[in-house]
Amino acid sequence: MNFEKIEEAYTLLLENVQVIQNKLSTNFYDALIEQNGIYLDGQTDLEIVKKNHQTLKSLKLSREEWRRAYQFILMKGAQTEPLQANHQFTPDAIGFLLIFIIDQLMVASDITLLEMGSGTGNLAETILNNSQKEIDYLGLEIDDLLIDLSASIAEVMGSKAHFAQGDAVRPQVLKESDLIISDLPVGYYPDDQIASRYQVASQTEHTYAHHLLMEQALKYLKVDGYAIFLAPNHLLTSPQSDLLKSWLKDNASLVAMIAFFSM
């Protein structure tokens, strides 16, 4: 991996985003999506963007170099236009720990992986670029902005990732997967009617969205598959935890829990 090339790519991408942002009077993230579209189809009257794209293509970045450049771009955007907490990308330290766990757990060399709440796609690309496994990946994401970001970035990178838009809590037509992962969005799910279909549903308040996603995930998991969730440390002690533990006892085998301590 060439860090000088990553830095140059970051500089070129940032200039393009800023030029497009000023031209279209739009926000940072929509400008980034637009820049990705221009990179792919070459249709623009912005000469500086065309020139920068020629330079970008001459760098011949690897997929991991592209990922790092986009990661820095998203971090730059967050300085002026912060994403909500549930939309921020999973840190690399956790991503690489997940890769180690996946490579150790999964026996087969070819696996299918479903990510529920794929966000910006950074975790997906971290895994696809660095795992020893051959992975058939699908990411499911409800947010319009995030699905456009992740899909356009993946196409620029030449990634094998596929993304679909949908509410992961609602029923989806998906094939069963060997592995399911989710950096769980934490909070309440607003639709009590949908939530009432689940065993983890609360009868007294909105149900935790992360509990619903865990239950839903197992519906798409092969019998001998694994689900890996990044969850809050108070998962098993929160007010609705008894509902979750009751469901876990009847429907899943808990292999391990790893706690990350915050400073």
Protein language model annotation of sequence segments:
Residues 170-181:
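A short acidic, Gly/Pro-enriched loop at the edge of an enzyme's catalytic core
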Residues 183-213, 234:
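Mobile active-site "lid"/loop adjacent to the S-adenosyl-L-methionine
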Residues 207-262:
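Conserved Class I SAM-dependent methyltransferase catalytic core
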Residues 150-151:
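Conserved SAM-binding loop
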Residues 108-119:
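Conserved class I S-adenosyl-L-methionine
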Residues 136-141:
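Conserved SAM-binding motif I beta-strand of class I
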Residues 120-133:
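Conserved SAM-binding loop of SAM-dependent methyltransferases across substrates and taxa
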Residues 1-77:
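A short N-terminal interaction module
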